[in-house]
């Protein structure tokens, strides 16, 4: 059975290696084309016995397939900043901390990560000042050898003195000037200094493990307690896995039989959303879920209020009572109004919800459009109304989690939403998910539709290196991948040196990348066009993917107005955002008023614990018409109890700091942070995917990833459709009303000027000349990035057309006499 299960991976091992080697060569070529040796597309050995290609893979259909968008000058600067060395230590002679005096920091144009936030000391020894900001391993070894030599000399002197004392001799020519106690103390200090290597970070800062004084009890009980808790967690995890296997067997044996099993197979085999909808409706009829939709009564929403408001809004719209309708909408357009956006309403059927809810959503959308187009409401009032609608209703965001190469499943999620025109304007990504988010936010809709195809695998070449090469790098640097090489290969996804601000101006989508500072006590930053508008996107992608042991922390790079590339945030280094904020829901709410988060979660250590005891959106409980529990009440209760017990002990380990800070990181956050959103998508992960968790996909694999991602997104699209139906109408209203600011007529300007001068000097008979400039024009939507605490919609500012002037008539234009 195992042989059959993994057999489909074996034929692709050869082509994948060949593809990686060819891409490594063609990427450095001037043309950057990856298909020069394969004009017909496909792998070189993907041919049948007749010599024809098995699959017609054609990379030429992808826009910019022959471009790399690499700016070598930027990469050279990036590499130079990463390799910048410290001022060498002039003397390796060790000095105690009491002999160190504070020294003013060296004035530099910027602060690099190697001397960021680190105290500086001046070591005074023989009137020589030494910058002992960081002592390398070589210096420590030299000090250790120095003290060993001193100790050997002292021992020889002592033994020689004892021998001569017995012989009655006087004096000792080899007598040292240094006291015996000082030498022994220095040797002991040097030994401690050598062992302190393991308690230092990479930038030389010593980890203070006992900063708050844990006491001797902590050191005695820490490791035994951690051992017993770890064994208990291992036992609980084993029991949890057994419960999940029993629940899956229970559902497959008792529920999915006969016609139900056939309909379920058709549902899972749907390649398009239309096919999936038809299969879902057939399955609902078979399971008896269709009857639930007709009955408006349900305890998870206020069906009485919704029914009354639907009739009232329709009546006011048909009677053309715009003022009354706009007042009612102010109270109705809110997030999850009367429970109509509750996920439970969409978890009872495979497709659809209550008919009353669908009618309300349709009527509400028509009412919003009617208010926008009604001539009975002036433009100023419309602008205020839609500003309130936007704030009350909020915004939606797509959050793509990390997860190594599992993150390529996000491609299918984005494709499914894009095909139905439901892709949110705000997209965030972390680690591997940041790469997909960057691709979605730097390309237009039409470009994305051409890019999200199986041939996209030819452009993903991050893991091209052979085993001996990356093992040697890992042994030498502590990281499997090279930062500069990854920066070069990610430039295609970011269109070169594009910044967050430039991406927003090009597509109107807001890219967010979560990164964590290398300092464990500094706050996390969510990079976007507000917090870091001029930051290069490819540098944020590297920082967000810098998992310890995989990629070393890197600096964010900033583009100046002159086009120069310099370090961002004083040159401090950043690492994988999944370590602390995989899903930055709170930050998105702060910056963009996001209150509906659609999360695509592919982290394997989190996805294995996903379990919806009462069903989830588009996936109801498979028995008892959706009214029961998955696996029965006993199975669901046991699953929840074990999972809560595991979480409790993880919180205990974090609270009492039992887990060591390996590579200066609190690893309990990997399990204890928030990983879900308003709606959470869990793409299906196969056991064979773990073998390629740090590997590049090939076209057949990419085709499967796109299929699985779309299959996961299909059940959630109806919920997202109802949400975006209102949100997009409000967004269109905001864009339309902000461009309807009344343009001043010449008579208005004359009246204003007359009033101003009459109030300032009523008795003056002096006539003034005035030039009326051309009408001011607004910037196009999506180009302004101004923001304020009171408005998250970033209204475009007004500016004058080129050539307009406020010069008087005597200087340039004919006068207008008032």
Curated annotation (Swiss-Prot):
Q: Locate the compositionally biased regions of type Polar residues.
A: 22-38
Q: Which InterPro entries does the record cross-reference, listed alphabetically?
A: Acyl_Trfase/lysoPLipase, NTE, PNPLA_dom, Triacylglycerol_lipase_N
Against SUPFAM superfamilies, the record matches this protein to: FabD/lysophospholipase-like
Region (Disordered): which ranges?
1-50, 154-178, 781-805
The family note in this entry says: Belongs to the PLPL family.
Domain PNPLA: residue ranges: 398-589
Q: Does the keyword Transmembrane apply?
A: yes
Tell me the membrane topology, using the record's own terms: Single-pass membrane protein
What UniProt keywords apply to this chain's record, in alphabetical order?
Hydrolase, Lipid degradation, Lipid metabolism, Membrane, Transmembrane, Transmembrane helix
> A cellular component term (GO) from this record?
membrane
This protein is called Patatin-like phospholipase domain-containing protein YALI0D16379g
Q: Which residues form a coiled coil?
A: none
Q: Where, by residue number, does the polypeptide cross the bilayer?
A: 223-243
Signal peptide bounds? none
> According to its UniProt record, which residues of this chain constitute the active site?
431, 576
Superkingdom, natural source: Eukaryota
**Any one GO biological process:** triglyceride metabolic process
Report a single Gene Ontology molecular function.
Answer: triacylglycerol lipase activity
Q: Where is this motif: GXSXG?
A: 429-433
- Where does the record place Basic and acidic residues bias? 164-178
Organism encoding this protein:
Yarrowia lipolytica (strain CLIB 122 / E 150)
Chief location of this protein within or outside the cell: membrane
Subcellular location, record wording? Membrane
User: Top enzyme class of this protein?
Assistant: hydrolase
Q: List its EC numbers.
A: 3.1.1.-
């Amino acid at each position: 059975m195992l042989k059959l299960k993994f057999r489909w991976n074996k034929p692709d091992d050869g082509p994948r290696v060949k593809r990686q080697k060819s891409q490594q060569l063609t990427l450095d070529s001037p043309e950057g084309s990856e298909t020069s040796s394969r004009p017909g597309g496909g792998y070189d050995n993907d041919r049948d016995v007749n010599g024809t290609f098995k699959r017609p893979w054609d990379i030429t259909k992808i826009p910019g397939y022959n471009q790399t968008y690499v700016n070598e000058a930027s990469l050279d600067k990036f590499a130079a900043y990463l390799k910048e060395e410290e001022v060498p230590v002039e003397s390796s002679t060790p000095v105690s901390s009491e002999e160190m005096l504070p020294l003013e920091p060296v004035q530099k144009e910027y602060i690099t990560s190697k001397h960021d936030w680190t105290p500086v000391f001046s070591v005074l020894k023989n009137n020589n000042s030494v910058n002992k900001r960081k002592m390398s391993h070589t210096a420590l070894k030299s000090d250790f050898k120095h003290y060993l030599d001193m100790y050997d000399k002292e021992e020889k002197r002592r033994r020689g003195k004892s021998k001569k004392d017995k012989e009655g001799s006087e004096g000792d020519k080899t007598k040292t000037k240094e006291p015996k106690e000082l030498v022994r103390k220095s040797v002991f200090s040097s030994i401690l200094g050598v062992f302190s290597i393991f308690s230092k970070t990479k930038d030389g800062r010593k980890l203070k493990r006992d900063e708050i004084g844990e006491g001797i009890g902590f050191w005695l009980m820490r490791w035994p307690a951690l051992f017993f808790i770890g064994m208990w967690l291992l036992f609980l995890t084993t029991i949890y896995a057994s419960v999940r296997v029993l629940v899956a067997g229970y559902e497959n044996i008792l529920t999915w039989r006969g016609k139900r099993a056939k309909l379920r197979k058709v549902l899972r085999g749907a390649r398009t959303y239309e096919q999936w909808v038809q299969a879902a409706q057939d399955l609902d009829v078979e399971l008896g879920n269709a009857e639930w939709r007709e009955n408006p009564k349900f305890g998870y929403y206020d069906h009485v209020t919704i029914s009354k408001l639907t009739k009232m809004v329709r009546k006011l719209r048909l009677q053309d009572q715009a003022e009354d309708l706009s007042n009612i909408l102010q109270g109705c357009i809110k997030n999850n109004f009367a429970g109509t956006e509750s996920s439970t309403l969409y978890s009872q059927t495979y497709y659809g919800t209550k008919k009353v809810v669908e009618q309300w959503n349709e009527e509400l959308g028509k009412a919003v459009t009617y208010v926008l187009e009604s001539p009975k409401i002036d433009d100023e009032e419309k602008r205020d109304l839609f500003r309130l609608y936007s704030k009350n209703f909020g915004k939606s965001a797509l959050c793509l989690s990390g997860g190594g190469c599992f993150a390529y499943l996000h491609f299918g999620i984005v494709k499914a939403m894009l095909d139905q025109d439901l892709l949110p304007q705000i997209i965030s990504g972390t680690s591997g998910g940041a790469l997909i988010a960057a691709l979605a936010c730097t390309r237009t809709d039409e470009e994305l539709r051409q890019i999200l195809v199986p041939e996209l695998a030819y452009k993903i070449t991050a893991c091209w290196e052979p085993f001996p090469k990356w093992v040697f790098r890992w042994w030498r640097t502590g990281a499997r991948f090279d930062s500069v090489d990854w920066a070069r290969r990610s430039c295609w996804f970011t269109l070169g040196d594009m910044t967050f601000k430039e991406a927003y101006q090009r597509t109107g989508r807001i890219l967010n990348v979560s990164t964590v500072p290398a300092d464990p006590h500094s706050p996390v930053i969510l990079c976007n066009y507000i917090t870091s508008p001029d930051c290069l996107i490819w540098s944020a992608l590297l920082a967000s993917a810098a998992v310890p042991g995989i990629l070393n922390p890197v600096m964010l790079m900033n583009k100046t107005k002159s086009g120069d590339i310099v370090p961002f945030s004083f040159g401090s280094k950043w690492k994988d955002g999944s370590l602390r904020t995989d899903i930055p829901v709170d930050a998105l709410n702060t910056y963009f008023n996001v209150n509906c988060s659609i999360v695509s979660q592919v982290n394997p250590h989190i996805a294995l614990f996903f379990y919806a005891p009462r069903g989830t959106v588009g996936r109801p409980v498979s028995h008892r018409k959706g009214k029961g529990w998955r696996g029965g009440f006993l199975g669901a209760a046991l699953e929840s109890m074990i999972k809560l017990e595991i979480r409790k002990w993880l919180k205990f380990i974090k609270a009492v700091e039992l887990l060591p800070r390996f590579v200066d990181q609190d690893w309990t956050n990997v399990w204890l942070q928030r990983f879900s959103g308003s709606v959470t998508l869990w793409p299906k992960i196969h056991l064979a995917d773990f073998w390629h968790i740090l590997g590049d996909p090939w076209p057949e694999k990419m085709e499967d990833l796109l299929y699985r991602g779309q299959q996961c997104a299909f059940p959630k699209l109806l919920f997202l459709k109802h949400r975006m139906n209102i949100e997009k109408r409000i967004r269109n209203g905001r864009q339309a009303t902000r461009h309807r600011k009344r343009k001043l007529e010449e008579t208005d300007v004359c009246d204003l000027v007359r009033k101003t001068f009459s109030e300032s000097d009523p008795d003056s008979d002096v006539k003034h000349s005035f030039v009326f400039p051309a009408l001011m024009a607004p910037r196009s939507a999506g180009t302004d990035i101004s923001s304020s605490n009171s408005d998250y919609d970033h209204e475009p500012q007004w500016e004058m057309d080129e050539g307009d002037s406020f010069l008087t008539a005597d200087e340039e234009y004919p006068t207008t006499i008032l």
